[in-house]
Amino acid sequence: MLGIWIVAFLFFGTSRGKEVCYERLGCFKDGLPWTRTFSTELVGLPWSPEKINTRFLLYTIHNPNAYQEISAVNSSTIQASYFGTDKITRINIAGWKTDGKWQRDMCNVLLQLEDINCINLDWINGSREYIHAVNNLRVVGAEVAYFIDVLMKKFEYSPSKVHLIGHSLGAHLAGEAGSRIPGLGRITGLDPAGPFFHNTPKEVRLDPSDANFVDVIHTNAARILFELGVGTIDACGHLDFYPNGGKHMPGCEDLITPLLKFNFNAYKKEMASFFDCNHARSYQFYAESILNPDAFIAYPCRSYTSFKAGNCFFCSKEGCPTMGHFADRFHFKNMKTNGSHYFLNTGSLSPFARWRHKLSVKLSGSEVTQGTVFLRVGGAVRKTGEFAIVSGKLEPGMTYTKLIDADVNVGNITSVQFIWKKHLFEDSQNKLGAEMVINTSGKYGYKSTFCSQDIMGPNILQNLKPC
């Protein structure tokens, strides 16, 4: 896989100044703005619609397992299908060289939640090679726009009810379609492709003007390929989400180990796995969010470094957005500001969602001791595991704070448990307790306080009560 990307950067030789026109779709040039930067030096003319053979495959609650192929060229196929003109339409758009499995999985999950028109776009004939796919996505984007235009004119269907979900090159393809349809409802970019799109004009790539609301999930972002990323680091939506920093996802292969062992065959295999894993996380996160409306809360921050340092655990009274399907519920979703970068952490395996808590504990006791303090928070049904809050010198009267990412959503906090464990060579008989614990969590930053007057020996559980 890496070789394809490198060839894409190094290959030159396409002539300039040509134009091709296709009935229904209009004309396409190979000049500006597609030749404005080095990263688009390979631009050429897109293939004909007949050669690409874009297909629209409809799934609904009436046919969740077997698609109906519908066509704007023959609108009677739409009329004869289960397409509902009173329903929202979500179109899943794959990127380069994709077999369509994630699209089918996406429709399957969406239809568990909603009675919608779920359409998978098949343009595999035009996307088997990356360089051709970059050029062909303009024609395919025009095909999507033509499809929506037919819905508008023949079925009085509002473009505001259309949501395009595009992965990799499919994100920019969605942007091309949106730029042709004023009032398009929403575009979700899933790790938009970087090569040939980094630092390009907005006419070339996905940007906030392409729909009423554009949200983006970055999972393998880089400024250049050799940063080991095939997505773009650039913000290109109203809300841009950078889970785990947006570059390398936990659970994806480590490239360093085989390289240090000089096992280059293993390294080549790991490289392909690395790109595929990180790039795919974007649609995996989105799919998981569909049935978890309270998951993937994200926080505004200048950088992931600052987020990890605990400097960005703040939501305004309007709350923080959630990454994924329910991002459009965010109050400020249409405001493109400098604060549109949002960060969060995920797990390394599915279920990926994590719920962030800020835990502050004030210790009580008589003497300083050496050990580790653990807290566990619980709701009406579930509890988190134990989280280490502080380790080392434990001083009564001091307050210690830690941000933790829980793998369960406990909802409203109803209980807090405290336990401390002394260090191996600590032989004192000291007792410690949690005088007060403050938990801050949720998209609105809810605070809850728990208290106790007890002090306990090591390894003895202390239960705190609301106060």
UniProtKB/Swiss-Prot annotation:
Keyword Cytoplasm attributed: no
Biological process terms in GO annotation: cholesterol homeostasis; fatty acid biosynthetic process; high-density lipoprotein particle remodeling; triglyceride catabolic process
Keyword entries, A-Z: Disulfide bond, Glycoprotein, Hydrolase, Lipid degradation, Lipid metabolism, Secreted, Signal
PROSITE patterns xrefs: LIPASE_SER (PS00120)
Ranges of residues in domain PLAT: 355-467
GO cellular component: extracellular region
Glycosylation sites: 74, 125
Signal peptide segment: 1-17
Keyword Amino-acid biosynthesis: no
Cellular compartments annotated: Secreted
Disulfide bridges in this chain: 21-27, 107-118, 252-277, 301-312, 315-320, 451-467
Tissues expressing the protein: Overexpressed in hepatocellular carcinoma.
A Pfam family recorded for this sequence: Lipase
Source organism, top-level taxon: Eukaryota
Broad class of enzyme this protein falls into: hydrolase
Main location: secreted
Recorded catalytic activity of this chain's protein: a triacylglycerol + H2O = a diacylglycerol + a fatty acid + H(+)
EC number: 3.1.1.3
Annotated active site: 168, 191, 279
InterPro entries recorded: AB_hydrolase_fold (IPR029058), Lipase (IPR013818), Lipase_LIPH (IPR016272), Lipase_N (IPR033906), Lipase_panc (IPR002331), PLAT/LH2_dom (IPR001024), PLAT/LH2_dom_sf (IPR036392), TAG_lipase (IPR000734)
An annotated Gene Ontology molecular function: lipoprotein lipase activity
Family that this chain belongs to: Belongs to the AB hydrolase superfamily. Lipase family.
Name of the featured protein: Pancreatic lipase-related protein 3
